[in-house]
């Protein structure tokens, strides 16, 4: 997970818990949901553009199986999605600082180097653009898959330890129907 996502998850969970109660969310398999009140929620951060400035509207959600299990238990799964414009580490200074902070090269990085795969661009900062809070039922997800605003993602991709990743789903945040949106705020969110 990138630092932006980690930071927003931690801050949001603390704020939600202190203002409206709730706890850390449950785990289903390897997937831990970030927050639980009446329903199960996950907090996401979504970069609105890639390192080349190309717009990105598809936000990666969770493990498909974990979402299904949460829906079976709670009936609704919610997502708190922060969209942001990233600052990319073009100079490599952020990566260098982070590598020094880690102290040693991770196994994932060693494997990447063996494959001669390029190191991905790091995000060194961001500006929050919007907050979108959505809730989805099983029926909403099925409808979204039929209509194309929810899709499968990451078949064949790998985790940091080299193991295969579980299938996730993505959502086109600009196509989510109004009946699934609880809050939509921006661009002057903060």
Placement of each model-derived feature along the sequence:
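Nucleic-acid endonuclease domains
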Residues: 1-31, 36, 44-190
């Amino acid at each position: 997970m990138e630092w932006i996502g980690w930071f927003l998850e931690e801050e949001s969970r603390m704020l939600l818990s202190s203002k409206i109660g709730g706890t850390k969310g449950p785990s289903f398999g390897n997937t831990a949901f970030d927050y639980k009140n009446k329903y199960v929620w996950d907090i996401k951060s979504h970069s609105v553009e890639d390192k080349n400035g190309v717009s990105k509207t598809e936000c990666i959600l969770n493990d498909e199986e974990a979402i299904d299990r949460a829906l079976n238990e709670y009936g609704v799964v919610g997502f708190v999605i922060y969209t942001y414009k990233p600052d990319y580490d073009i100079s490599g200074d952020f990566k260098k600082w982070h590598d020094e902070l880690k102290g040693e090269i991770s196994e994932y990085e060693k494997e990447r180097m063996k494959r001669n795969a390029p190191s991905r661009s790091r995000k060194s900062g961001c500006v929050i653009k919007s907050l979108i809070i959505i809730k989805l039922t099983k029926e909403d997800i099925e409808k979204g898959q039929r209509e194309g605003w929810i899709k499968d993602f990451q078949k064949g991709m790998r985790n940091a330890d080299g193991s295969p990743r579980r299938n996730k789903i993505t959502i086109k945040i600009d196509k989510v129907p109004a009946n699934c949106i609880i809050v939509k705020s921006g661009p002057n969110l903060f």
